C-alpha cells in the first residue's frame, strides 16, 4: 500500500464527514468526540439500549470500546452491533484491558460471536489475551514490554478472528490474515495521555466509513494519526502531556493529505 492511498482517504473522510457512533468508556468520551471533530468526522456518543439500534442505522461506522463495562453496556453493544451489521456499516472493537478480568474477556468474546466485527484494535497484550496466547503481559489496561513477534501475532489473530486486526505499539501493524502492513509513525507522548488509543480506534472507524478495504483504511488511519502525533510533539517540545493532548487535537485538524503523503512511513512485512 502506498501513502497516496492514505492521503486520498483522508481527503475523502473530510469531504464526506462520516457519522461515527461510539459506545465507548467514561474516561475517553469527550476526548474521542473532540478528536473526531478535529479530523473532520461527526461523533455521536449514544449507549442507552433503548436507542442504540436505531442510532446505528443513522451512522456510517460503529465503534465498541469495553474500557468501562457494565452488563447493560454489553447488551447495548450487541444490539447496536447487530443493527450495524444489518445496515452493512463497519463495526470496530477496542478490547481495552481484556486480559485484566474474566468479565472483560467474556464480554469481548460475546461481541465477537454475536456481531460481525470489521476491525479489532488493541495493544499486543490485549490481542494475545483474545487468542489466549501466552507470553504477552499487561498491567491493568496497559501493555507491558514483550519480546514476541508482533507481526506473527497480528496475522494469527486476523486468521483466528476472521477480521482485520490492528496492533498498536512502537511500530503499528495491521493484517487481514494474509498481508501484514507496518506503520512507522507516531510518538512516545501518545502513551502519556489517556484515551489516545481509544480515539485512534474511532479514527480508524471514520476511515473505514470512507469505503476502502478495511486493511487499507486501517493502515491509512494509522499513518494519518502517527503523522499528526509527530507534528503535535514538535509543538509540545519541552512542555508536558497536557500540552501534547491539546496539540494532538490541533494536529488532527491541521494535518493534510500532503503531510501524510510525504511523512508517512509504511512497510509490508513477510511472516
From Swiss-Prot:
InterPro entries: Hyethyz_kinase, Ribokinase-like
Gene3D superfamilies xrefs: 3.40.1190.20
E.C. number: 2.7.1.50
Cofactors demanded by this protein: Mg(2+)
SUPFAM superfamilies, per database record: Ribokinase-like
Pfam families registered for this protein in UniProt: HK
Cystine bridges: none
Residues bound to ATP: 121, 168
Binding site for substrate: 45, 195
Keywords per UniProt: ATP-binding, Kinase, Magnesium, Metal-binding, Nucleotide-binding, Thiamine biosynthesis, Transferase
Keyword Membrane recorded: no
Keyword set includes Transmembrane helix: no
GO cellular component term of the entry, any: cytosol
An annotated GO BP: thiamine biosynthetic process
GO molecular function: ATP binding; hydroxyethylthiazole kinase activity; hydroxymethylpyrimidine kinase activity; magnesium ion binding; phosphomethylpyrimidine kinase activity
Domain of life of the organism encoding this protein: Bacteria
Catalysed reactions, as listed in the record: 5-(2-hydroxyethyl)-4-methylthiazole + ATP = 4-methyl-5-(2-phosphooxyethyl)-thiazole + ADP + H(+)
Pathways per UniProt: Cofactor biosynthesis; thiamine diphosphate biosynthesis; 4-methyl-5-(2-phosphoethyl)-thiazole from 5-(2-hydroxyethyl)-4-methylthiazole: step 1/1
NCBIfam families according to UniProt: PRK09355.1, thiM
Family: Belongs to the Thz kinase family.
Functional summary from the UniProt entry: Catalyzes the phosphorylation of the hydroxyl group of 4-methyl-5-beta-hydroxyethylthiazole (THZ).
Protein name, entry field: Hydroxyethylthiazole kinase
Source taxonomy: Bacteria, Bacillati, Bacillota, Bacilli, Bacillales
Gene for this chain: thiM
Amino acid at each position: 500500500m502506498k501513502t497516496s492511498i492514505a492521503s486520498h482517504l483522508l481527503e475523502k473522510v473530510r469531504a464526506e464527514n462520516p457519522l461515527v457512533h461510539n459506545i465507548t468508556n467514561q474516561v475517553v468520551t469527550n476526548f474521542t468526540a473532540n478528536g473526531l471533530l478535529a479530523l473532520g468526522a461527526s461523533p455521536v456518543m449514544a449507549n442507552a439500549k433503548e436507542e442504540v439500534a436505531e442510532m446505528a442505522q443513522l451512522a456510517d461506522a460503529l465503534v465498541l470500546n469495553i474500557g468501562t463495562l457494565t452488563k447493560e453496556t454489553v447488551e447495548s453493544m450487541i444490539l447496536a452491533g447487530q443493527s450495524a451489521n444489518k445496515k452493512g456499516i463497519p463495526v470496530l472493537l477496542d478490547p481495552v484491558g481484556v486480559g485484566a478480568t474474566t468479565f472483560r474477556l467474556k464480554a469481548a468474546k460475546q461481541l465477537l460471536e454475536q456481531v460481525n466485527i470489521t476491525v479489532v484494535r488493541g495493544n499486543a497484550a490485549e490481542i494475545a489475551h483474545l487468542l489466549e496466547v501466552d507470553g504477552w503481559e499487561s498491567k491493568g489496561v496497559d501493555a507491558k514490554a514483550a519480546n514476541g513477534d508482533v507481526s506473527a501475532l497480528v496475522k494469527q489473530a486476523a486468521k483466528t478472528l476472521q477480521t482485520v486486526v490492528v496492533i498498536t505499539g512502537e511500530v503499528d501493524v495491521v493484517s487481514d490474515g494474509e498481508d501484514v502492513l507496518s506503520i512507522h509513525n507516531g510518538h512516545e507522548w501518545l502513551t502519556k495521555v489517556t484515551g489516545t488509543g481509544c480515539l485512534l480506534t474511532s479514527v480508524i472507524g471514520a476511515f473505514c466509513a470512507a469505503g476502502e478495504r478495511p486493511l487499507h483504511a486501517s493502515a491509512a488511519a494509522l499513518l494519518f494519526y502517527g503523522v499528526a502525533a509527530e507534528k503535535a510533539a514538535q509543538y509540545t517540545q519541552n512542555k508536558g502531556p497536557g500540552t501534547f493532548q491539546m496539540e494532538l487535537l490541533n494536529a488532527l485538524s491541521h494535518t493534510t493529505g500532503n503531510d501524510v503523503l510525504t511523512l508517512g512511513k509504511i512497510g509490508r512485512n513477510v511472516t
